[in-house]
């Protein structure tokens, strides 16, 4: 399945049942990730340090457990700091794919990457989203169904995730799409580009589900150790995602923990 996607998704999307057409826009859009403001978290860290120094000076051992708990909670916030990321492409159910050309140009100019290769890598990512969406429609017998049909509404509800599942659904979607993009870059010889996807400081620090793209790290690590195993893991995630975002998300967490 993964091989079929990578061989056709740019040059022959029709073989995957995908339309070749997509929209292009010159607007610059940013998407915010994380939960906590960096300045506020830094301020909280300084306050904790002062309390620790005061505790050491006064030998107030009784307050140590509470301070330790506060420090643990503060450290968790370091993995959820807010940051913005320039949007390069977008897939929206019912609207299709949009690629943001100026954003792609800006990214390539900043890093010295080949524009055509980076453009196609974004297209890979968004087309995997579209392919995934079509698979969900098919699973709910909603492919070609009327918008007002019960099957279509059920598929739409599932695709976006039901309330608390929304963040988990986003992680699963981005993991499947971004890993395909990362592997496509490797196969095209764009090694520096693929490596950079995992090394942006803010992105490397922020964890799932607050940064859904972080889920790809486990699959990338597995590919390095066993390319055959990662193909099986990818197919497993894809199948799980059609019935349970939660189960697919838990599998991604396991892969990330093992990396």
Model segments located where?
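A metal-dependent hydrolase signature that marks the N-terminal structural subdomain at the beginning
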Residues: 1-115, 239-247
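Residue-level recognition of hydrophobic positions within alpha-helical transmembrane segments
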Residues: 22, 56, 122-125, 170, ...
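Glycine-centered structural positions embedded in regular secondary structure
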Residues: 82, 88-90, 128, 175, ...
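Residue-level detector of short, conserved catalytic/binding motifs and their immediate flanks
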Residues: 95, 118-122, 175
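Post-HEXXH active-site segment of zinc metalloproteases
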Residues: 117, 133-175
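Active-site recognition of the HExxH zinc-binding catalytic motif
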Residues: 121-137, 178
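An active-site-proximal "capping" alpha-helix that borders the catalytic cofactor pocket
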Residues: 170-186
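Pan-zinc metallopeptidase signature
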Residues: 185-259
């Amino acid at each position: 399945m993964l091989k079929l996607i990578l061989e056709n998704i740019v040059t022959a999307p029709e073989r995957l049942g995908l339309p070749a057409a997509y929209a292009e826009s010159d607007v610059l859009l940013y998407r915010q990730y994380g939960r906590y403001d960096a300045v506020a978290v830094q301020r909280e860290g300084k306050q904790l340090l002062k309390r620790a120094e005061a505790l050491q000076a006064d030998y107030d051992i009784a307050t140590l457990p509470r301070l330790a708990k506060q420090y643990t909670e503060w450290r968790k916030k370091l993995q959820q700091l807010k940051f913005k990321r320039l949007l390069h492409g977008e897939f929206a159910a019912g609207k299709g794919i949009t690629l943001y050309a100026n954003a792609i140009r800006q990214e390539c100019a900043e890093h010295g990457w080949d524009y055509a290769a980076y453009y196609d890598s974004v297209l890979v990512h968004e087309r995997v989203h579209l392919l995934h969406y079509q698979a969900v429609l098919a699973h709910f017998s909603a492919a070609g169904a009327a918008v007002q049909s019960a099957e279509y509404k059920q598929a739409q509800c599932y695709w976006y995730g039901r309330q608390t599942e929304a963040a988990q659904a986003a992680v699963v979607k981005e993991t499947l799409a971004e890993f395909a993009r990362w592997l496509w870059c490797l196969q095209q010889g764009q090694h520096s580009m693929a490596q950079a996807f995992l090394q942006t400081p803010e992105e490397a620090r922020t964890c799932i589900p607050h940064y859904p793209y972080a889920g790809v790290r486990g699959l990338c690590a597995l590919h390095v150790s066993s390319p055959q195993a990662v193909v099986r893991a990818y197919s497993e995630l894809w199948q799980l995602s059609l019935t349970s975002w939660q189960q697919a998300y838990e599998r991604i967490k396991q892969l990330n923990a093992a990396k």
